[in-house]
């Protein structure tokens, strides 16, 4: 019987007991600074890294295959479990791809609410990055302050949808709920607090901190050419001097109507990326303030009108026979998009997050592919870690801001 060819990682047969001066160690997958289930096989000469092999797959759940066996609406909550630090960004990217496939557009008010939720999630994710990155380097106090501000953002999400981490706050065709009473005032108050704390607390603790700068400056240098060739996006790409943001280049929702800047750093190191994240948070609060007036001007319609794909409002389902029958069919059998394929990119807090969907006219996707930014940034580690010291490995991993829910999928 012919033996099938087995594809094995090229580090599987590494000899950990060497006679020369090199040493091979495992970093992770249980290491607290691995930012998830990351295993790094590091080959060292003294304290200097000469080779680095990222080993992924410890969190693989077969999410893309699950999409082929679930209706389009059933699959949406599963996207929460990709980048679980900013789950609404995943919900939205998937919903937008399905909407493009269906040829529908969310109502104006739903677009305003979605944009608000996306920027709140961007702030939550960036605060989490600052907190964990500072903790990795040893700045414990910044971790506590950043988690305090993040908690208020999670409270806003809980007030809106009832969930704090995995939100499922977006629907295909719109949003399920209008904003609660007093929610906008809480959001503006939070934005004011975030801006104040960024300027007077985080900058005071970090920006000119001698130890912080020594740990980050000229560490994890990524040239613009390397960033582009490895497929980097988001802050990892803009931190290398490349001005590219999907919200500006291919605007979606209301981003084309909003006035905001795209921070870019030409330092190309970990310190430049840290400064870029700080400035992006200021831009997110700026966007949120602009959305308040647009919300008040919009009509209170939350879901697109497309009876063949989307259920009618609850009031119509309870009073109209046709709406009830259509709702029953959509729930039990699922919507049937037309045949075709679509890829839609969005700007998640970590970079370009896009979904490719191929439809054969059935209630289930024939193929779904998630283009997650953390996957590409993890691959980059095998290049930027070479030549650095073992003490800087944690700093570099932290500055890439990878989350393994969207790496392994």
Curated annotation (Swiss-Prot):
Its main location: membrane. The keyword Transport applies. It holds the Pfam family Complex1_49kDa. One of its GO terms (cellular component) is plasma membrane. It is found in: Cell inner membrane. Keywords: Cell inner membrane, Cell membrane, Membrane, NAD, Quinone, Translocase, Transport, Ubiquinone. It is an enzyme of class 7 (translocase). GO terms for molecular function: NAD binding; NADH:ubiquinone reductase (non-electrogenic) activity; quinone binding. It comes from the Bacteria. It catalyses: a quinone + NADH + 5 H(+)(in) = a quinol + NAD(+) + 4 H(+)(out). Its EC number is 7.1.1.-. InterPro entries: NADH_Q_OxRdtase_suD, NDH1_su_D/H, NiFe-Hase_large. Belongs to the complex I 49 kDa subunit family. NDH-1 is composed of 14 different subunits. Subunits NuoB, C, D, E, F, and G constitute the peripheral sector of the complex. NDH-1 shuttles electrons from NADH, via FMN and iron-sulfur (Fe-S) centers, to quinones in the respiratory chain. The immediate electron acceptor for the enzyme in this species is believed to be ubiquinone. Couples the redox reaction to proton translocation (for every two electrons transferred, four hydrogen ions are translocated across the cytoplasmic membrane), and thus conserves the redox energy in a proton gradient. NCBIfam families: NuoD, PRK06075.1. This is NADH-quinone oxidoreductase subunit D.
């Amino acid at each position: 019987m012919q033996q099938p060819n087995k594809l094995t990682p090229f580090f599987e047969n590494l000899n950990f007991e060497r006679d020369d001066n090199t040493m091979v160690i495992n970093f992770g997958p249980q290491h607290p600074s691995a930012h998830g289930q990351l295993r790094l096989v590091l080959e060292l000469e003294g304290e200097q890294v000469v080779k680095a092999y990222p080993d992924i797959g410890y969190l693989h759940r077969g999410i893309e295959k699950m999409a082929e066996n679930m209706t389009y609406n059933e699959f949406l909550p599963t996207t929460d479990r990709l980048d679980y630090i900013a789950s609404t960004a995943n919900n939205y990217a998937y919903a937008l791809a399905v909407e493009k496939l269906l040829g529908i557009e969310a109502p104006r008010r739903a677009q305003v609410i979605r944009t608000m939720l996306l920027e709140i999630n961007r702030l939550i994710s960036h605060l989490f990055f600052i907190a964990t990155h500072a903790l990795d380097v040893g700045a414990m106090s910044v971790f506590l302050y950043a988690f305090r501000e993040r908690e208020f953002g999670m409270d806003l999400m809980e007030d809106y949808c009832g969930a704090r981490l995995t939100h499922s706050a977006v629907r295909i065709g719109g949003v399920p709920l209008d904003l609660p009473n007093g929610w906008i005032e809480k959001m503006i108050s939070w934005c004011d607090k975030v801006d104040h704390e960024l300027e007077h607390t985080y900058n005071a603790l970090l920006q000119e901190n001698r130890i912080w700068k020594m740990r980050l400056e000229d560490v994890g240098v990524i040239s613009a050419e390397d960033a582009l060739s490895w497929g980097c996006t988001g802050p990892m790409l803009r931190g290398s001097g490349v001005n590219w943001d999907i919200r500006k280049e291919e605007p979606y929702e209301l981003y084309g109507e909003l006035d905001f800047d795209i921070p870019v750093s030409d330092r190309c190191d970990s310190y430049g990326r840290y400064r870029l994240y700080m400035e992006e948070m200021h831009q997110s609060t700026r966007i949120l303030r602009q959305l308040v007036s647009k919300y008040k001007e919009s009509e209170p319609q939350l879901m697109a009108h497309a009876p063949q794909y989307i259920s009618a409002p609850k009031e119509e389902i309870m009073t109209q026979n046709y709406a009830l029958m259509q709702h029953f069919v959509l729930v039990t059998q699922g919507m049937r998009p037309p045949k075709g394929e679509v890829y839609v990119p969005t700007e998640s807090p970590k970079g370009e997050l896009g979904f490719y969907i191929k439809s054969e006219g059935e209630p289930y996707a024939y193929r779904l592919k998630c283009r997650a930014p953390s996957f590409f940034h993890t691959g980059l580690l095998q290049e930027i870690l070479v030549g650095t010291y073992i003490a800087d490995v944690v700093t570099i991993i932290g500055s890439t801001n990878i989350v393994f829910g969207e790496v392994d999928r």
